[in-house]
Amino acid sequence: MCGIIAVLRRPSDRKVPTAERITAPLVGAVDLLARVEPDLLGEAADLLGEADRLLGGVPGLLALDRDPTLVGRINEVLAPVPAHLASLEAAVAGSPDVEAANAALVRVRDVLWAVSRDRLDTFAGVTSLRQDRPVPSDAGLAVLLSAQQALSALDRLEVRGRDSAGLQVTVWNHGIDQHDPEVVARSADPLHRSGSVRVLDGGGLAFVVKASAEIGELGDNTAVLRSALVADGLLARALAAPAVQGSLLGHTRWASVGLISEPNAHPVDSTRADGELVPLVTVVQNGDVDNHADLAASEGLSLAPEITTDAKVVPALCAAHLAAGRERLEAFRRTVNAFEGSVAIGMATGDAPDRLLLSLRGSGQGLFVGLAEDTFVVASEPYGVVELTADYLRMDGETPADPDDPGASRGQIVELDAAIAGSVDGITRRSYDGRNLPVTTADLSRAEVTTRDIDRGDHPHFLIKEIGES
């Protein structure tokens, strides 16, 4: 059991909302709740939803960042709400249509949670990640928003495994010379341990932070990742560039193949042990590549002995296909077709930092592509995407595209394009045998859970929470 997360974002063209624009629907909603009339709950939920929408994405983040009083104003407006909700509980119990009134009350609670926890807490998380020397640009804050959202999802996905974790922050248009002494020094680690940097074909930089511990609590690993990001002065320099863009690829691991160590923590990259230069590929993987040892031998993959995870063969083999001149998507397709086992993969390549490749085959894993404002968020469970969006595409690793050829056509491959992030137009989907599988809005599902449902609060484990609530 492991967890995959990825965030791919395009620059937003929505205007940054004013404080008044954000607080007005909140004030209206609180006024309606104060009337303690169940029939008004739906209208109040709509107003709260409008405020949540305005606070979402990069424009909402920038609104909070530019007005240091806004968080306090929002909290002040919402302060009377708990008392109103307590009164409404009794009113709902006496409503002629208790079921409908209770559903509206649940919706109000869900959206209030989204505003206070998902939006305001996300802003606090971004603030904790930033450095003020140098100050991040607005574009840099957008990258930090993606990082915060990825870390938040990893916190939730840790229940699928937590002996190690890793996060790759890939940036381009950053203005840093690839021959900068710190870049050169940090790109020399062949084991891709925490703090490593990889230089992309177009001059972009991929920063990786990792944590590894056999014993620990939920949240320990992401705390280590956060601290490493905050301490990274080179990353801070990149995020100060006015036009910087970035993508995130992360993983939390339960080791099934390979030791618990930083070199084995994902993402793993395509660096060869013999020093031969190959195209840059980085990968996160759930499940096991059962024939990884056979592939390493038959394909002549040069793997460092310190890296014993089966996932290492994925970028190594894909890099070999790229080096042979194959196009990116075809190289990926050939790579994943070589594997035996139930496997989910997220892959980034050095020639296209604005693209993300995904594959899923078998019944034991899952991948969900969330479509949020200007953003794709990918997770191995729906609860990894719901902080950003309720709408997602579920990849199907079992149904054959051609029932007459199930062996070859079972499994799906997806390519995401940051230039059209958040839209089905930015999703290219194919079967394992290369058949085009167009994606429309009819293919999307809607999550039935919210972040309020899956929050474990102050409980160290979900089991303890469930026992306490039973």
Language-model features, listed with the residues they occupy:
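Conserved short alpha-helical segments that host acidic/polar catalytic motifs at enzyme active sites
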Residues: 1-469
